Structures are given as C-alpha cells and as structure tokens.
Amino acid sequence: MRRGGEPQCDGREFRIASSPAREREDDNETAPPQTSAAQEPLVDCFLGTVPNSCFVRCELI
C-alpha cells in the first residue's frame, strides 16, 4: 500500500505533526524522553493529525 504522494508527507507532514506532538508530550512527563520521542510520530498518526497516506508511512517509520 504505497503511494507516490507518500514522500511529501514523510517530510512536510512529519514536521508539522511533530509540533503538536511535542506540546502534548510536555503534559505527559510521565513517559521517558526516549520513548516519547520514538512514539511522537506514531502518536501523531494515530491521533489523526496526518492524512491516511501518511499514517501508513508513520507505521513503517
């Protein structure tokens, strides 16, 4: 399930998704920094911040 428009989402969409995720992580200081950073992109995708096409890419990453 790969699309030609995925690479674009991987760069721009990923960056935009990292912004809201970071703010949310600030509130969740219970999780370790390493785990939070690794789950940042995944959480963003699961939350629906990124389009479905990006969701697949996030899972792979």
Swiss-Prot record:
Annotated region described as Disordered, given as residue ranges: 1-40
Organism: Caenorhabditis elegans
Biased composition (Basic and acidic residues): 9-25
Domain of life: Eukaryota
Protein known as: Uncharacterized protein T28D9.11
